[in-house]
Amino acid sequence: MRKIIGIFLLSFTGGLAGAWFWTNYYLLPQLQRNTEAQYSPTTYDSPVVYDNPVQENNIPPSDSESETDFSLAASRAIPSVVYINSIFKGASFSPFDWFFGGTTSQTRVSSGSGVIFTADGYIVTNNHVIETAEKIEVNYNKKIYTAELIGTDPSTDLAVLKIDEKNLPAIRFGSSRNLQVGEWVVAIGNPFSLSSTVTAGIVSAKGRRIGILEDRFPIESFIQTDAAINPGNSGGALVNKNGELVGINTAILSRTGSYTGYAFAVPVDITRKVVDDIVKYGVVQRAFFGGNVIDYNYENARKYDLDTNVPAFNGVLLESLMRDGPADKAGLKPGDVITHVNGVEVNSRSAFEEELSYRYPGDKVTFTYLRNGKANTTTLTLVNKGGSTELVRRKIYSSATIGAQLEATDYGVRAFKITGGYFKELGIPENYTIISINRVRVKDPQEVIDFFEKYKGRVYLYGMNSSREIIPYDFILR
């Protein structure tokens, strides 16, 4: 079984130059522009059962005489917010380590917040809170749990965890679509490692798109609030005055890294769909209409020679179409102004994308649109990113020889649940992504398995750990 006989240092200066150039000018810029999805095995047969259904704002308000008394909201929501530690090993590596070794690592810890979604232990947080973690701890009620990472969705910056516990105080659910600008909201989290901190503010805006998500298909329709949110609040709860969840605290706009008046939360209606999909399918189901829209405004109207003398620029402008895609087949054309999706007004790109985010591949939707000043309607069938109407399911490969489970990612093949075999012998870390083997890019997990089961000879394994730090391996299989 032991075919690995040693780890050897490279010795050619050309290899050093090539590794340095490829790392710094090709790979790392790509990694800085993208966000990697991470998952762990789970069973997807049963949907999430919520213990506290949406209340639709029908809980009696607080008896307090003051409109700015948030004690009811705090008392209801604080028990449902947890403290999260993300533990990972940070390696220090330079291209010279290809020659001389010398990589070092140390344990690092970052913290954030999470919200208990169900009484049986499902917790939602931000993807950026746990994306580099090799181990995740949930601190709740003076007890520390090791959490299982069920799945993440970089397109919304959300992640789902699971702890082994029952009868937890699940958060009450409100409706972000019913939330009004100017309404009071309360942010609950653990800023600067201060547990159960409560701040209050109002809803400053809805449907904000601020360009912070680096996924290929980002969905940004944030709730903006002036409630103070600081480092450590990420993944915490944004609730209304009744203590019902309306958003997951996610980001701030700041030049200092601390609160300066602008904070943003993922709407709860989007969050619930993401959680349901991850638990049931292992991945989030995204539905595409086969085109790209931009905001409809004066400048874009001029660009498409549209009438600029209109009372208001309501809707979104169809910029481009995928040939033979759903929108193309439905008769839509670039320059059309989409005003409604299934009767719901969409007056911004973020509103349009949010409306589609609730849909599934195979769903039929009706678009109302303007062409030459005339209103029209058309119905189309949404598809997945592969162009079919099938639901997407996560696919995991296992190999006793490698001693790990594998799955395809945007960058290569990720190895996780490493329990033995070659990868354990080599000391490959959990959530290591294989980018290339013997300088050939890899994308298919089965190809990796076949290689390790059949190949004999020297192997150059190039990849990155969960912190996206490059770690190469050089060894021989016999």
Regions found by a protein language model. Name each.
Residues Y460-S466:
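Short, exposed beta-strand-loop hairpins at the edges of beta-sheets
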Residues K443-Q446:
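A conserved acidic, glycine/proline-rich C-terminal tail/linker
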Residues K3-G6, S11-L16, W20-P334, H340-E345, ...:
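Serine-dependent protease modules
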Residues I78, I396-I428:
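Extracytoplasmic/periplasm-facing segments of secreted or lipoprotein envelope proteins
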Residues G335, N431:
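Conserved catalytic motifs of ABC-family nucleotide-binding domains
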Residues P154-D157, D410, R468:
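Short acidic/glycine-enriched loop/turn segments that link adjacent beta-strands
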Residues T378-L380, P472-I476:
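Edge beta-strands of extracellular beta-sandwich domains
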